[in-house]
Amino acid sequence: DYLNKIFLGKPKRVLVERAETGENFKKSYNAALARLRNKSWNWLTFPGLEPHKDLTEELQNWIIAQRAAKKTFKAVLPCSAANNEGIVNFSSSGIKVGAKTYSAYEYCARIAGLLAGLSMTESATYQVLSEIDSITESLTPNEDIDEGKFILINDGEKVKVARGVNSLHILSGDKTEDMKKIKIIEGMDLMRDDIRSAFENNYIGINNSYDNKVMFVAAINQYFDGLVREGVLYGDAENTADILWIQFCES
């Protein structure tokens, strides 16, 4: 059922890691995370988390640590007030689909599949989940969104995503208002992965000359131009890379 829910969102690829039940659960869970650390993926969900609610904070901290290490991992977790752009705090419950009612824990898989399947020009905001008959509706949806909660709403005809936000809601340091939006973080992560991949595959190991630096910067700017044409970057913004020179002078 969880995999079927994920595929409703039409993700390009799905990785499945298995964890044992019973006394070996924690060991196999840690082994699964270790395997995932060195794989390429974007969105994580853990459909069987509800019996192990104590792991929610541990899992969110793992994602945050991986992002600090320049990974672009993100996760959909239930009722997780992480205040981090890499965590989507799914907070709707009482989700009725046919004869079955799902909790937030159980429906995170559907949300992860939805987010993974969106193109870079699409937002999660107002995306319709047509299979849902009803939900336990929030009495304070605007306040929930402001607190970094990803919730579903019923407009009287259909159930849909209220707004495509992650759990970031208290800004500090280099965190900006735009970074509360899942779509913005997806674009930032895409550029980080693509530029790093281009550098590692085409420029590491060659002479670090000025001409080669100029070639790399030109390739990045050409890449930015492509993102503008595709609608990922705003065309009226200054989407350019350059070489920064710092000269130290002795007094």
Residue ranges of each PLM-predicted region?
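Surface-exposed assembly/interface segments
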Residues: 1-251
